[in-house]
């Protein structure tokens, strides 16, 4: 009986204890360079959950990153994988005893360098052993957006809508009702992201709009690289709608002044009592989608009302364009 018990104990040691101990010994011997390389490979391949698992819960708390209320794109996905060019571990620890390393990633043909810091932990973990990343490769980026969209997402993570429907969404003072019309508006967010190329997805409110990312018309990706940390996503009227707006604004403004609102248009504070004739100069455009026109209304008492009218395009629920013109 004793021999059987002894044999069971031996078997347990051979098949259970020794592999566990051996595994712990192996993990404890993983170098900082190997841990940093695993972390870099996880980011390059878009395995962000694996990269996050290597980071401490307080990662970057002391590095000045200050994520705050930033949208966490580390929970998103890249449109295409990158590759690790090199991993270099510094010879000396910093004053806090942390091990520094520099990782180079090849992203869309460009080499991106990130400096990370690791520190030893008490319990070994898979792939990285006794190391964890306390200052990671993600950084804060500003993504600004403007236009017409019910949702804009980057890397599968929503940044919210651009504009809104109805009078509450108007970006200039409209006294008349715009119920059911979608106004352009601003949006975007501060994001916290690893280096990579991220898909930009836009839920358009109209097919008469076009998308530009970082001033590239028709682009559908956003690059988090080493350069500018500011990005711009625009969902604006397409060229044919812009041209239509400019061509039609003169006649729409004239009709509004005379009190004869064209079908589909919205006139706000435009009517001039006693107006018999209206002159409207060619419109001028600001840097965005706002058109301005100089209007002169000749009244039947020989008086003249001269003012500048403002106009924007809104879209209805079917995505059709409507001209909104106001007298501020």
Residue ranges and their predicted role:
Residues 4-25:
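Hydrophobic membrane-insertion alpha-helices, especially the h-region
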Residues 11, 113, 237-241:
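Intrinsically disordered, low-complexity segments enriched in small/polar residues
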Residues 203-239, 310, 314:
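Structured interaction patches on ligand/partner-binding surfaces of diverse proteins
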Residues 246-328:
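Membrane-lipid interaction segments
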């Amino acid at each position: 009986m004793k021999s059987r018990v002894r044999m069971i104990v031996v078997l347990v040691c051979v098949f259970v204890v020794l592999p566990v101990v051996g595994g712990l010994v192996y993990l404890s011997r993983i170098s900082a360079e190997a841990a940093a390389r695993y972390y870099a490979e996880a980011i390059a391949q878009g395995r962000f959950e694996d990269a996050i698992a290597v980071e401490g819960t307080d990662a970057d708390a002391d590095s000045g990153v200050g994520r705050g209320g930033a949208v966490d794109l580390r929970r998103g996905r890249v449109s295409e994988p990158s590759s690790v060019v090199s991993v270099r571990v510094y010879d000396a620890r910093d004053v806090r005893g942390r091990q520094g390393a520099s990782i180079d990633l090849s992203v869309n043909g460009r080499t991106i360098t990130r400096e990370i810091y690791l520190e030893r932990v008490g319990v070994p973990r898979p792939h990285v052993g006794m190391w964890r990343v306390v200052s990671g490769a993600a950084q804060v980026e500003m993504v600004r957006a403007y236009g017409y969209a019910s949702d804009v997402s980057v890397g599968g993570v929503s940044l919210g809508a651009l504009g809104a429907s109805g009078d509450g969404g108007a970006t200039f003072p409209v006294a008349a009702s715009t119920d059911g019309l979608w106004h352009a508006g601003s949006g975007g967010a501060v994001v916290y992201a690893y280096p990579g190329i991220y898909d930009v997805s836009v839920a358009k409110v109209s097919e008469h709009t076009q998308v530009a990312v970082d001033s590239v018309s028709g682009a559908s990706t956003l690059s988090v690289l080493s350069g500018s940390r500011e990005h711009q996503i625009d969902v604006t009227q397409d060229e044919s709608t812009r041209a239509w707006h400019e061509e039609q604004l003169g006649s729409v403004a004239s009709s509004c002044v005379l009190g004869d609102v064209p079908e589909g248009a919205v006139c706000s504070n435009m009517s001039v009592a006693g107006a018999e004739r209206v002159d409207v100069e060619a419109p001028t455009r600001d840097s965005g989608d706002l058109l301005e026109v100089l209007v002169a209304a000749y009244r039947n008492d020989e008086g003249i009302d001269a003012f500048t009218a403002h106009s924007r395009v809104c879209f209805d629920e079917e995505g059709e364009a409507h001209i909104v013109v106001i007298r501020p």
